[in-house]
């Protein structure tokens, strides 16, 4: 029997899809190339709240360059977001859904110029765009610049563009020093230009750490020149670079769930897409980790309302999945929250590592990011032991002195309710390479606002953050 060549064949050969993904051998999700730490992850987390940081986003995301007279139509047809009023020098958080209304992924779309866009984000939404560009009769050209290898093994790495963010309460001081004068603070997700070391650099008003800042990018060959200039200008303001260890944990404070399971494994309307996706695609090799267990892969799917993307849904245009979303009552859907994990229970998890007489310790909780799969799914339980939600992104904030997770829970559960998160996997753990033999623990966790950071809740200008759960 020949080896599978596409996702549909992988699924047919793999038996139960949940079992296949929960036992994937892909390993941990890696943020490649960037050094794990430049100082230490605690100081780096502290700096994005108290001084300024340089995030290096050059290597861990797919860049998809989309050009042509149908480029805007391709995006409009595949996104829940409204295309009305979208024009060059504005960006959107692009969210596509399946014909059944479930989220595929998300990313940022930069409207660079007439008929010219770039998507930046994880693979699932990029793959969806490429599929429709190739099969939908659109007059577009696509350049796919894949993320850097997770383990380059000493080989040179090349991208089309470098991508940084300058963030933190003193970020604008750094930015204006670099620029050589006052720089207008544009509205959220608006684009402009600034000067860095004699170069004209494009900018996006953005923030990931709960304070206004800029995302900036340029040709890859100018990366070192730009980076050195930023670090030099930032010295007097306490700016430090953030490594790949701390970087992904910033979303625990700002409230974005980066990795919902792409909801494409079932449904006749998606069969052609599964046949298009190669056997080594993100979707075919990705891993699910956590205590939530169902034999039905669809129980891991989420719709936009469940992870805070309700404000993006606009029925002012035709798009894939519109009919399914129109049939949903948003008020009855699960809602995104932060769960603040109990400190005493966390101490118990770590104490178990030093218990020489126990048969097994609790699942290791890595710091600052505790996820151990591409897609994370821990069961959230109420006092009666009923599953009332799914915890989807987990780690520790040195700024808050808390273990936190981003979750979607039943809509009627108010902020302040104590629930439990079942930490670890059943029966000693699955066969994933990231899972050691362990036992499970029910960790108390209080339903809390999202974003958890007060700064993020009060200063963000865009999208779902203004519709944050606060009560």
UniProtKB/Swiss-Prot annotation:
GO biological process, alphabetically ordered: lignin catabolic process; methylation
Quote the annotated effect of residue 31 to A: Almost loss or loss of activity on vanillate
What's the catalysed reaction?
vanillate + (6S)-5,6,7,8-tetrahydrofolate = (6S)-5-methyl-5,6,7,8-tetrahydrofolate + 3,4-dihydroxybenzoate; 3-O-methylgallate + (6S)-5,6,7,8-tetrahydrofolate = 3,4,5-trihydroxybenzoate + (6S)-5-methyl-5,6,7,8-tetrahydrofolate
Q: Which pathway does the record list? A: Secondary metabolite metabolism; lignin degradation
Record-listed (6S)-5,6,7,8-tetrahydrofolate binding positions:
57, 93, 120, 165, 215, 256
Q: What class of enzyme is it?
A: transferase
Quaternary structure note: Homodimer.
Put simply, this protein is called Vanillate/3-O-methylgallate O-demethylase
Q: From which organism does this entry originate? A: Sphingobium sp. (strain NBRC 103272 / SYK-6)
Q: What is the lineage of its organism?
A: Bacteria, Pseudomonadati, Pseudomonadota, Alphaproteobacteria, Sphingomonadales
Which gene name does the record give? ligM
